[in-house]
Amino acid sequence: MDSSGGFQKHTCGHALLLLLLLLAGGAEAFRICAFNAQRLTLAKVAREYVMDTLVRILARCDITVLQEVVDSTGSAIPLLLRELNRFDGSGPYSSLSSPLLGRGAYKEKYAYIYRSHRTQVLNFYLYPDEDDLFAREPFVGQFSLPSKVLPSLVLVPLHTTPKAVEPELKALYEVFLDVSQRWQSEDVILLGDFNADCASLTKKRLDELVLRTQAGFHWAVADGVDTTVRASTHCTYDRIVLHGERLQSLLRNAGAFDFPQSFGLTEEEALNISDHYPVEVELSRAVHRIQPLSLATLLLSLLLLLLSPQLGLAA
């Protein structure tokens, strides 16, 4: 009897289990984020430590909606995308940006940054704000999901102006109705810097909004979650609201990402990035297909299989 046989079988089992885990990367969550990047310009992203931090934030998400992109050159997002695609192999990433939006000289754009091997843009449009209800009308996007449960969803980003939070959030319900009818989709995420707290909107007025009273809407980033960087403030300005039974059934987690704490930044350092935390939702069971493996992982797996007999890993 080979006294090492048990060891060989045990080791072989671990090796095969490791390989199966590598191949079964499809069980991971799908993360959707919204981030007010605070006056994002070409000069800002050209600062190395700002770029490095932004890339680390974006690399956590499958889709990020950036707000307050005020770059008039059109070069900031491509530069950010280039560095993101060089970062850690989690890409490739692509982007989709709105035109510059605003009533006066000050204008912003929305920008979607997304992992193009996990999701694709199916449709998009700028909400036709004929009555000028929004300072920055939503730039609506429909995205595919690698899911049999939920093959696509719609994102409706909004950065409200602090002087008109309540009327803009009332009008956001009309945008929801418009997109639901246009694309026959009930699975919709409303997200962004709503300024829906503190001095901008009282709790009483917030709770009177149709988006709060109408059945079917789930405010995933709950009241009381601090989405601001400054220690002197505690406001839930940034929100993510989910509509649709299938979409809500996939919700695994939601909240704000405290990037200063995660990355070891002081408040002063963090404020050079933004005065807002990103907010995010994670959808479980969203991904069902095998994720692409890196070349190094494939080579390591093949080497392990080829060397198993020599290493005594075979039973």
UniProtKB/Swiss-Prot annotation:
Stored SMART domains: DNaseIc
Instruction: From the UniProt annotation, give the residues forming the signal peptide.
Output: 1-29
Q: Which GO terms describe its cellular component?
A: endoplasmic reticulum; nucleus
SUPFAM superfamilies cross-referenced by the UniProt entry: DNase I-like (SSF56219)
Q: Which residues form the active site?
A: E108, H159
Glycan-carrying positions? N272
Q: Which gene encodes it?
A: DNASE1L1
Q: What is its EC number?
A: 3.1.21.-
Q: List the disulfide bonds in this chain.
A: C198-C235
Q: What family is this?
A: Belongs to the DNase I family.
State a single Gene Ontology molecular function.
deoxyribonuclease I activity
- Decide whether keyword Membrane is in the record: no
Q: Which organism is it from?
A: Sus scrofa
Looking up InterPro entries in the UniProt record yields: DNase_I, DNASE_I_2, Endo/exonu/phosph_ase_sf, Endo/exonuclease/phosphatase
For this protein, the record's PROSITE patterns field holds:
DNASE_I_2
Q: What is this protein called?
A: Deoxyribonuclease-1-like 1
Q: Which UniProt keywords apply?
A: Disulfide bond, Endonuclease, Endoplasmic reticulum, Glycoprotein, Hydrolase, Nuclease, Signal
List where in the cell it is found: Endoplasmic reticulum
- Keyword Hydrolase carried by entry: yes
Q: What class of enzyme is it?
A: hydrolase
Q: Name one GO biological process term.
A: DNA catabolic process
